[in-house]
Curated annotation (Swiss-Prot):
Organism in which the protein naturally occurs: Rattus norvegicus
Function: Cell adhesion molecule that mediates homophilic cell-cell adhesion in a Ca(2+)-independent manner. Promotes neurite outgrowth in hippocampal neurons.
Signal sequence interval, chain numbering: 1-16
Membrane topology value: Single-pass type I membrane protein
Entry comment, domain topic: Lacks a cytoplasmic PDZ-binding domain, which has been implicated in function of related LRFN proteins.
Transmembrane regions listed in the UniProt entry: 540-560
Gene from which this protein is expressed: Lrfn3
Domain LRRNT: 19-59
Glycan attachment positions: N339, N348, N393
Compositional bias of kind Low complexity: 406-423
Stated name of the protein: Leucine-rich repeat and fibronectin type-III domain-containing protein 3
Length: 626
């Protein structure tokens, strides 16, 4: 009993004499090596055959290496709460997907290696939270798209960006221009075809720019390039020098690259791909005088165009030059035209006015410009009065009033023009439809001598079954036309118009000649031919029947012959078989009996038996004397 009070007295002193216990640490993932004995903590799992990020990671780790594994995705929870992580390597895995916000807790991360994976795009939320990131390695992926806001959180801190060996055709150049602290920018081995002017003008700390092996035909001058000496190789170059690499591009060596040719550079492997005269030559061996451009030349423009108000109009202008000229349009009022609610400008030099107005009439100017100069061409557009209102699916056959010829509707507006109506009645202008059959009809109209300057006639018609208007252009000297390919058993509405040149306005106009309605005859329905399989089956059955009948007849004949020539009862001879007795009297002496003449050979008979009854020869049978 005396021991218990002693233990109670010593119990308060026990914690003071025990050493402090370290904080509990997570177990090291299988096949990984963990450094947890001293700071900084690290988890090293290279080549461990991992299929996903281990869930038992020590969240206090400052370095995590998961390279050379088979990780296919990075989920939101995989790296959660790793606020002290400084270096993360996910190189050479099979990562196809990175969840939005997967790195949101890695606010202290300095380096992120995602090279050698299978990423196809990088969105705005996938790199969110990396506010201290300095090195971002995305090379050797399959990136085809980079979102404009993908680098927003690390734009002010990023120093090294590697996008090489991807499938990038376009880049968010405005976003790249905000990387003010970037030192190295790797864009090599992509599919970039152009770089906008001034794309690198704000990258004041840029020391190396690699654009090797892209599809660049030209490199625009940039203030950054003119401010720093360019050297092909960094060896021996000053610290402030910019290293620019652009070999392996199909450079078009014309006057746009003279600025680059004038810069002092060490030996490099750039070569010209075009024009043909310079193709394959070493870039730095081509003299400056050979970097020439050709001024633009307008090769095609639209002829004077006349359209009624409210209709669309298309103005075209084509030009050639080196480099390819850019075509712009100037309105008759002197305004530079572009895409708007009423007009659309296309890169090929076409200007489309969606709805023309009277004030649009005048001279439009086409301007083709390139680095060597510019060329202009004028296109006249006349906007006439709007056409008279037309009923739906109808074409008026009334003649226009004097001095108001209706403008010829352009083919592009044919669907919006007046159509032949279902209620058109034959007029008194002499348009007749004769000799109409099931699929053809002959149209005749009188001579239009009162209308001068007729260029051609136009026949337009449609059937009662559809609203598609069909046009036929007829020479001016014709007075009839045979319509073919008509549908049988349908009613057609038809109008004939005279196309002529109006002397007052100089425009092409139309005047109705007349309209008519006719019906095609119904087609005779031919007898349906028997189906081929049916014919084949019938022939087989008939042939089989003939064969069976022949066999039956043959068997019947055999049976009949057997019955007629069959075996007779014994003791009777056939009546039809004459037999001469061989027992005859020959002058009372025995001698050889002459045989009867041999009968003519008869048809073979099966199993024919002939029995002859011969009485014994003796004295009692001698014939009586005379």
């Amino acid at each position: 009993m005396a021991v218990l009070p002693l233990l109670l007295c010593l119990l308060p002193l026990a914690p003071a004499s025990s050493p402090p216990q370290p904080a509990t640490s997570s177990p090291c993932p299988r096949r990984c090596r963990c450094q947890t004995q001293s700071l900084p903590l690290s988890v090293l799992c290279p080549g461990a055959g991992l299929l996903f990020v281990p869930p038992s990671l020590d969240r206090r780790a400052a370095e995590l290496r998961l390279a050379d594994n088979f990780i296919a995705a990075v989920r939101r929870r995989d790296l959660a709460n790793m606020t002290g992580l400084l270096h993360l390597s996910l190189s050479r895995n099979t990562i196809r997907h990175v969840a939005a916000g997967a790195f949101a807790d890695l606010r202290a991360l300095r380096a992120l290696h995602l090279d050698g994976n299978r990423l196809t795009s990088l969105g705005e939320g996938q790199l969110r939270g990396l506010v201290n990131l300095r090195h971002l390695i995305l090379s050797n992926n399959q990136l085809a798209a980079l979102a404009a806001g993908a680098l927003d959180d690390c734009a002010e801190t990023l120093e090294d960006l590697d996008l090489s060996y991807n499938n990038l055709e376009q880049l968010p150049w405005e976003a790249l221009g905000r990387l003010g602290n970037v030192n190295t920018l790797g864009l090599d081995h992509n599919l970039l075809a152009s770089v906008p002017a001034g794309a690198f003008s704000r990258l004041h700390k840029l020391a190396r720019l690699d654009m090797t092996s892209n599809r660049l035909t030209t490199i625009p001058p940039d203030p950054l390039f003119s401010r720093l000496p360019l050297l092909a190789r960094p060896r021996g170059s000053p610290a402030s020098a910019l290293v620019l690499a652009f070999g392996g591009n199909p450079l078009h060596c014309n006057c746009e690259l003279v600025w680059l040719r004038r810069l002092a550079r060490e030996d490099d492997l750039e070569a010209c791909a075009s024009p043909p005269a310079l193709g394959g030559r070493y870039f730095w061996a081509v003299g400056e005088e050979e970097f020439v451009c050709e001024p633009p030349v307008v090769t095609h423009r639209s002829p004077p165009l006349a359209v009624p108000a409210g209709r669309p109009a298309a103005l075209r202008c084509r030009a050639v030059g080196d480099p390819e000229p850019r075509v712009r349009w100037v309105s008759p009022q002197g305004r530079l035209l572009g895409n708007s609610s009423r007009a659309r400008a296309f890169p090929n030099g076409t200007l489309e006015l969606l709805v023309t107005e009277p004030e649009d009439g005048g001279t439009f100017t086409c301007i083709a410009a390139n680095a060597a100069g510019e060329a202009t061409a004028a296109v006249e557009l006349t906007v006439g009065p709007p056409p008279p209102p037309q009923l739906a699916n109808s074409t008026s056959c009334d003649p226009p009033r004097d001095g108001e010829p209706d403008a010829l509707t352009p083919p592009s507006a044919a669907s919006a023009s007046a159509k032949v109506a279902d209620t058109v009645a034959p007029t008194d202008r002499g348009v007749q439809v004769t000799e109409h059959g099931a699929t053809a009809a002959l149209v005749q109209w009188p001579d239009q001598r009162p209308v001068p300057g007729i260029r051609m006639y136009q026949i337009q018609y449609n059937s009662s079954a559809d609203d598609i208007l069909v046009y036929r252009m007829i020479p001016a000297d014709s007075r009839s036309f045979l319509l073919t390919d008509l549908a049988s058993g349908r009613t057609y509405d038809l109008c004939v118009l005279a196309v002529y040149e109006d002397s007052a306005t100089g425009l092409t106009a139309t005047r109705p000649v007349g309209c008519a309605r006719f019906s095609t005859e119904p087609a005779l329905r031919p007898c349906a031919a028997p189906h081929a399989p049916f014919l084949g089956g019938t022939m087989i059955i008939a042939l089989g029947g003939v064969i069976v009948a022949s066999v039956l007849v043959f068997i019947f004949v055999l049976l009949l012959r057997y019955k007629v020539h069959g075996v007779q009862p014994p003791g009777k001879a056939k009546a039809t078989a004459p037999v001469s007795s061989v027992c005859s009297q020959t002058n009372g002496a025995l001698g050889p009996v002459p045989s009867a003449p041999a009968p003519e050979p008869a048809a073979p008979r099966a199993h024919t038996v002939v029995q002859l009854d011969c009485e014994p020869w003796g004295p009692s049978h001698e014939p009586a004397g005379p």
